[in-house]
Amino acid sequence: MSTENNAPVVNNFIRSIIDEDLATGRRSSVVTRFPPEPNGFAHIGHAKAICINFGLAEDYNGQCNLRMDDTNPEKESDEFVEAFKQDISWLGFKWNGEVRYASDYFDRLYDYAVELIQAGKAYVDDLSAEEMRQYRGNLTEPGKNSPYRDRTPEENLDLFTRMKNGEFPDGSKTLRLKIDMASGNINLRDPAIYRIRRVHHHRTGDKWCIYPMYDYTHCISDAIEGITHSLCSLEFEDHRPLYDWVLDNISIEHHPQQIEFSRLELLYALTSKRKLQALVNDGAVTGWDDPRMPTIAGMRRRGYSPAGIKLFAQRIGVSKSENIIDMAILEGAVRETLENDSPRVMAVVNPLKVTLTNYDAAVTASRSAPFHPHHPEFGERDVPIAREIWIERDDFAETPPPKWQRLTAGGEVRLRYSYVIKCDEVVKDAADEIVELKCSIDHDTLGKNPEGRKVKGVIHWVSAEHAIQADVRWYERLFTEQRPDAVRGEDGEYVDFRQFLNPESLKLVPAYVEASVLQAEPESRFQFERLGYFVTDRYEHRKGDKAVFNRTVGLKDSWK
């Protein structure tokens, strides 16, 4: 699949199938589709599918359709449609033509159902949902035919027409395919393809009171759109015979090939829209785009880049094997792309006051510093110094451990892009807490090493006079368990995944940051030197007024 970096394209079995199809003339082009249900926001699992479908279409100079699978109107909305469109565009992909909807094909789907009824291949059933389950059988026992299975095509057509016209109550009748109740594949045991459901649809309004089922809708929609390779996750492998049966038994010429790949399971995260919705509803997160959420909108707000997400999708590859991926792989891909693209600035998140006792405005000079050590085109910024500065409290130790190279009483350290300073005095309050360090500058060390001694430590800092205050949201992983929805209690039942929410997943940290960041636009990514990668918040950062940062990821994996 396509990525924005120079990493090699990973071979996958889908690519091999496409290569053979094109080489043999079975297909002359590649048309894929991404068909989400608009009942929530896109998450990291969708991101993988997006990269596969759109990426393969790009690589083969083909096309990828965006189609909303809107056959379940109770849970779907225009809000989720727009969210999917935004996320796909933000990732850098373009769909073919206009956004398509399964509901665009409701009339044609109905006509094909009539065709199946007339051919004696579908029937109206009066069994209740519970009765249908009892008749279906299981993996070891065949199902039983419904007592309504042998209705004539004429009777079935009359009943189906009346279903459409609203003459029967919700759930009282279904339209089922007549396949084989003894099939070893339960999906072929006369699956229902229409149900009565009086629900307002976000696009068709109240026109329909019957709605087609996913398995029926999906394959026909693919065929209508001329999809060549219908790529879906592995749980639909057992549905493929039904996909093929429907298309083989209606008067439609095009027959796409369904190909399944393993779905993504990301450790320390959830990829169930239902469970993510529960987190939103419970107030465990601030919304679908909370930076702790594994949604594309959440990852975007946290500062993940499209290139990082694409690199992640490319690295995990495409296979039929179980695809359980550690969060560190995602964070590593994001970190790698941010390292190359992020300007550097200094920020202090746990400040300790330092007074430079021999600071003299006439002789104490400031320097400029590059925004990126390897990209001179990023430019430079001024790093002003003043009599009072802030350093990280963690960069001072009154009683240092072995091999300590940062500041200590009587010790020296270099201020990044500035002078070597020496701690001459430690000031404490009545509670014996350190509140200030009094240090002296070696004025001969600006841009050069001190004479006769070696100073190894370098720390970051900001000028108390020039730095701005910023709100920093320090994010960690949302869950403490690798697989929060797969933990069983002593009774053998699954434990509520919400019990494993990380109470330390968000800390609000007041910080001091170089003044240049105040002019940054929302969604500007930075490396805070020695601290990690941060982004100005998409909504709450206000250029020239209020600086709000979200922690994206650390400089290295801290969860090993």
Curated annotation (Swiss-Prot):
Superkingdom as given in the UniProt entry: Bacteria
Family note: Belongs to the class-I aminoacyl-tRNA synthetase family.
Residue positions of motif 'HIGH' region: 36-46
Organism annotation: Chromobacterium violaceum (strain ATCC 12472 / DSM 30191 / JCM 1249 / CCUG 213 / NBRC 12614 / NCIMB 9131 / NCTC 9757 / MK)
PANTHER family attached to this UniProt entry: GLUTAMATE--TRNA LIGASE (PTHR43097:SF5), GLUTAMINE-TRNA LIGASE (PTHR43097)
SUPFAM superfamilies, alphabetized: Nucleotidylyl transferase (SSF52374), Ribosomal protein L25-like (SSF50715)
Listed name of the protein: Glutamine--tRNA ligase
Catalytic activity, as annotated: tRNA(Gln) + L-glutamine + ATP = L-glutaminyl-tRNA(Gln) + AMP + diphosphate
UniProt subcellular location: Cytoplasm
Quaternary assembly: Monomer.
Gene that this polypeptide is encoded by: glnS
Gene3D superfamilies to which the protein is assigned, alphabetical: Glutamyl-trna Synthetase, Domain 2, Glutamyl-tRNA Synthetase, Domain 3, HUPs, Ribosomal Protein L25, Chain P
